Design a protein with these regions (language model features):
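An amphipathic, basic-hydrophobic alpha-helix
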Residues: 67-96, 114
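Donor-nucleotide binding loops and adjacent catalytic segments primarily
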Residues: 38, 43-51, 175-220
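An aromatic- and histidine-rich active-site surface loop
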Residues: 42-46, 94-115
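Conserved nucleotide-sugar phosphate-binding/catalytic loop shared by glycosyltransferases and other
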Residues: 6-12, 29-74, 163
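Active-site-proximal region of nucleotide-activated glycan assembly enzymes
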Residues: 3, 34, 53-54, 113-174
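Gly/Ala-rich phosphate-binding loop of Rossmann-like dinucleotide-binding domains
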Residues: 25, 29, 113, 136, ...
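A short, glycine/small-residue-rich beta-strand->loop->alpha-helix junction that serves as a flexible
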Residues: 9-22, 197
Length: 220
């Protein structure tokens, strides 16, 4: 029996980072990887109870520059999280680490760089996030959803690999039975947690317009 490859996935605290991480973990597990996920308290709430046994919660914070007190506090928390990550990785060294973006992924990836553990970062936005931008010089590769990623130097182009959005296998294996023509418009809606305004204000107007035009719609 083949020995499982150990992989660690570090995800930020919003849905835009967590769900691609969950989808990546699902795919790696199917390929016989032993997967552990690290996130913060914000990200932890997105996981199902059955999945939480493989999820670790580390403290995290962005670098807050509003005043000296907050700067010192946030910097101390980041340094503590890096130290904790160093200790964890020293005793639980994975073969590969994936950083999915967000400041909660930063300490693990910095610790990986110090310990010379290979890590790959993933960016699903059009503009690279601050954490990923800081990590890019140390990363083996950066996986991107859009080929024309903004905010990175051309000297890192060789590290860029376009993979698209990491979505659920259920969407990839979309059943042909659901595509049978029934004179209805099927709309697939995808979005992160910060797309709430679009979901709440724009999409309802679009759906109402379809209804006014007599178009039957099905939202997936």
């Amino acid at each position: 029996m083949n020995k499982k490859i150990r992989a660690l996935i570090a995800v930020g605290g919003t849905g835009g980072h967590v769900f691609p991480g969950i989808n990546l973990a699902s795919n790696l597990i199917k390929k016989n990887y032993n997967v552990t996920i690290v996130t913060d308290k914000r990200g932890y709430k997105f996981f199902k109870e059955t999945d939480k046994k493989n999820v670790l919660v580390f403290p995290s914070s962005p670098l807050i520059k509003k005043n000296v007190v907050l700067l010192i506090f946030s910097l101390s928390l980041i340094l503590y999280s890096i130290l904790r990550s160093l200790i964890f990785l020293s005793y639980n060294r994975p073969s590969i680490i994936f950083g999915m973006g967000g400041y909660a992924s930063f300490p693990i990836c910095i610790a990986a760089a110090i310990l010379r553990i290979k890590f790959i970062i993933y960016e699903n936005n059009l503009i690279i996030g601050r954490a990923n931008k800081k990590l890019l010089p140390f990363a083996e590769r950066i996986l991107v959803s859009n080929k024309k990623l903004e905010g990175i130097s051309s000297k890192y182009n060789f590290k860029t690999v376009q993979v698209g959005n990491i979505i659920k296998r259920e969407i990839i294996n979309f059943s042909l039975d659901l595509r049978i023509e029934k004179k209805e418009l099927k709309i697939l809606v995808l979005g992160g947690s910060q797309a709430a305004k679009i979901f709440a204000e724009i999409l309802p107007k679009i759906f109402k317009k379809c209804s006014d035009l007599g178009i039957s719609i099905k939202i997936i």
